[in-house]
């Protein structure tokens, strides 16, 4: 049975400023770097053999820190990027007009094919995330990969594995540097294919996530 670990990147400057990142980028904060080191300490005990990351800077830096702890190299895969947020990227959430907030809400409230102008739909995101996950099945036997990606992207992946449509209301919280695990199984008793073992584990982190403090 293949086990795949899923990690959201560490806290970034724009996370702290409540700016929309999407496929734009901002660096990890000092707290985000510490979170990544704590993932690395946990990952060191898991027998990780491959670290595959979104090619955006915040995920690359998170992956590099984890890789140093695990003694692995880092492989970049653009399919693991965050949802393209189109014309709203780099904007402060509190600056959105009523119309713009309506576009953003369509991505989280169950609107079929909701998208921000010049952006990506949740279905398009789901298709590329599942393709990236499926490529793990081509790794050598005994591999245990760890994928570093983004909050909306990983939430969409895990939710669709559970059978929800890609555009379903977002009800899965994956905090910065949370760890999830999905397994690929072939069983006569349980559902064959991808199953969710854990989602959003933050027990390895020693401080509350930024979004916990902002609520």
Swiss-Prot record:
PROSITE patterns: PG_MUTASE (PS00175). Pathway: Carbohydrate degradation; glycolysis; pyruvate from D-glyceraldehyde 3-phosphate: step 3/5. It holds the Pfam family His_Phos_1. Keywords: Glycolysis, Isomerase. The record marks 150 as: Transition state stabilizer. Coiled coil: none annotated. It catalyses: (2R)-2-phosphoglycerate = (2R)-3-phosphoglycerate. One of its GO terms (biological process) is glycolytic process. One of its GO terms (cellular component) is cytoplasm. Its EC number is 5.4.2.-. The keyword ATP-binding does not apply. The active site is at 9 (tele-phosphohistidine intermediate), 82 (proton donor/acceptor). GO terms for molecular function: phosphatase activity; phosphoglycerate mutase activity. InterPro entries: His_Pase_superF_clade-1, His_PPase_superfam, PG/BPGM_mutase_AS, PGM_Phosphatase, Phosphoglycerate_mutase_GpmB. It is an enzyme of class 5 (isomerase). Substrate binds at residues 8-15, 21-22, 58, 60, 82-85, 104-105, 151-152. Belongs to the phosphoglycerate mutase family. GpmB subfamily. This is Probable phosphoglycerate mutase GpmB.
């Amino acid at each position: 049975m293949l086990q795949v670990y899923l990690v959201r990147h560490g806290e970034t400057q724009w996370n702290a400023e409540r700016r929309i990142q999407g496929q734009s980028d901002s660096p990890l904060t000092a707290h985000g770097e510490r979170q990544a080191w704590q993932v690395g300490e946990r990952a060191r005990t898991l027998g990780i053999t491959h670290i595959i990351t979104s090619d955006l800077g915040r995920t690359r830096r998170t992956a590099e820190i984890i890789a140093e702890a695990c003694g692995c190299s880092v492989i970049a895969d653009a399919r693991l990027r965050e949802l393209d947020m189109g014309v709203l990227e780099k904007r402060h959430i509190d600056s959105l007009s009523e119309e713009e907030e309506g576009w953003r809400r369509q991505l989280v409230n169950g609107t079929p094919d909701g998208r921000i102008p010049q952006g990506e739909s949740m279905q398009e995101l789901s298709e590329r995330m599942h393709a990236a996950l499926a490529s793990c099945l081509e790794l050598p036997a005994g591999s245990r990969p760890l994928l570093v990606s983004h909050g909306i992207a990983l939430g969409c992946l895990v939710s669709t594995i559970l059978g929800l449509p890609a555009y379903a209301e977002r009800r899965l919280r994956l905090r910065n540097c949370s760890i999830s695990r999905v397994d690929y199984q072939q069983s006569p008793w349980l559902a064959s294919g991808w199953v969710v073992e854990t989602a959003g584990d933050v027990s390895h982190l020693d401080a509350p996530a930024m979004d916990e403090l902002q609520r």
